[in-house]
Every structure is written in structure tokens, then in C-alpha cells.
């Protein structure tokens, strides 16, 4: 469809909005007084920064935009563009791996370690945490409960999420939502990378 749809996500106190731009649609440039993080969830398109900078965005890409930077979006003509917009606090703990105005593939920010799970925190603030994790073959997180709702973004490979006693397979490009205090575990099938928004 050729519509633009935005939906507020109630995952945390931080303002999170899911946007779906239909084929060939756009959002005019605007700026925020706070930093903004964009996470591509589906399709492809462009982000237009300031006067004439253009960066391409697609699934599992991440873009950090500095405060007071003009930013508009346009969807591709084939499949549209979907992304999550996160308005961050002015004072935030942001990992230096993220550079303002650069599109980054999340899965390329973290390497595998033999027999281990590696974790890289990208954003940390009181009401929001965003991290990426790399599970070597056979590694897993034991059953546990999280203090808030969360979304998993499968970045590479395949994993099995056990959620409240039921197994769910997630593959690159898939997302999975956890409710607050839901019992869950995650196991790699082969090597597996994911991002977690909590």
C-alpha cells in the first residue's frame, strides 16, 4: 500500500514509534532536540539528513542522528520501508561504535567468541537498554524473566526462543516480543546474532 503508518510502542518509558512507509512515500524533514536512533525492520529506503546528505536504510540497519539534525525519510518503490524510531534522553550512554549520520549493520558490530555469548551494549539509560549479542554454536541463555517488555531482532543465523513453555524458531530478519516477567530462554542453532531492545 502507498500509506505511511505510525504506531506508538509501549515497551518502555522512552518514546518508541514503529513506522511503515508504503512504496514511494516519504516523511518530510524535521529535527528533534534529543538524539534519535532508527532501526530498520523491513524493506529499504533512504534517510535524508540536513540539506543534501542521503543514507540508505534497510532491514537490521541502525542509524544514530544527533540532536537538531534535519532528517526525512523516503521509501523505495519496490517494498516500502519499516523502522523503529527511538527518541533518546539528551544525556545518554551511547557506545562509541555508533557514529552520527552513518548507517551501520548491527550484526557487523560484534564478533563470535568460541564457546561463548558476547554482548555489546549500544545504548543504556534508566528506562531503555539496547544491546547486540552473538551466540556461538550451542550456546544459550537459561530460563529467566525480564523486568520489562522487550523485542528481539534476529540479525544472523537461527535461534530457538522458549517462551512460556513453547519453542519458537527465529531466523535473520525475524522479531519476537516478550511481555514483562514472561519466562523465556534463547538457544543458538549454529551461530546466532540478535539485538535486544529492553
Report the location of each language-model feature.
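Short strand-coil-strand connectors
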Residues: 12, 50-51, 162-166, 189
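Conserved short histidine dyad/triad with adjacent acidic residue
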Residues: 2-4, 15-32, 115-119, 129-146
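Short acidic-glycine-tyrosine-enriched beta hairpin
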Residues: 51-68, 164-181
Amino acid at each position: 500500500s502507498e500509506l505511511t503508518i505510525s504506531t506508538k510502542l509501549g515497551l518502555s518509558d522512552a518514546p518508541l514509534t514503529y513506522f511503515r512507509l508504503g512504496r514511494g512515500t516519504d516523511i518530510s524533514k524535521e529535527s528533534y532536540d534529543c538524539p534519535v536512533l532508527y532501526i530498520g525492520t523491513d524493506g529499504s529506503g533512504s534517510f535524508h539528513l540536513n540539506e543534501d546528505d542521503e543514507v540508505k536504510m534497510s532491514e537490521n540497519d541502525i542509524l544514530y542522528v544527533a540532536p537538531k539534525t534535519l532528517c526525512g525519510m523516503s521509501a523505495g518503490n519496490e517494498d516500502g520501508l519499516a523502522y523503529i524510531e527511538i527518541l533518546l534522553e539528551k544525556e545518554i550512554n551511547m557506545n562509541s561504535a555508533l557514529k552520527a549520520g552513518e548507517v551501520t549493520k548491527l550484526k557487523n558490530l560484534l564478533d563470535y567468541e568460541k564457546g561463548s555469548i558476547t554482548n555489546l551494549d549500544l545504548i543504556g539509560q534508566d528506562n531503555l537498554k539496547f544491546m547486540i549479542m552473538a551466540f556461538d554454536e550451542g550456546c544459550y541463555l537459561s530460563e529467566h524473566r525480564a523486568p520489562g517488555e522487550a523485542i528481539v531482532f534476529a540479525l544472523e543465523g537461527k535461534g530457538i526462543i522458549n517462551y512460556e513453555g513453547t519453542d519458537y524458531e527465529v531466523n535473520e530478519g525475524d522479531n519476537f516480543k516478550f511481555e514483562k516477567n514472561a519466562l523465556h530462554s534463547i538457544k543458538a542453532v549454529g551461530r546466532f546474532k540478535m539485538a535486544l531492545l529492553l
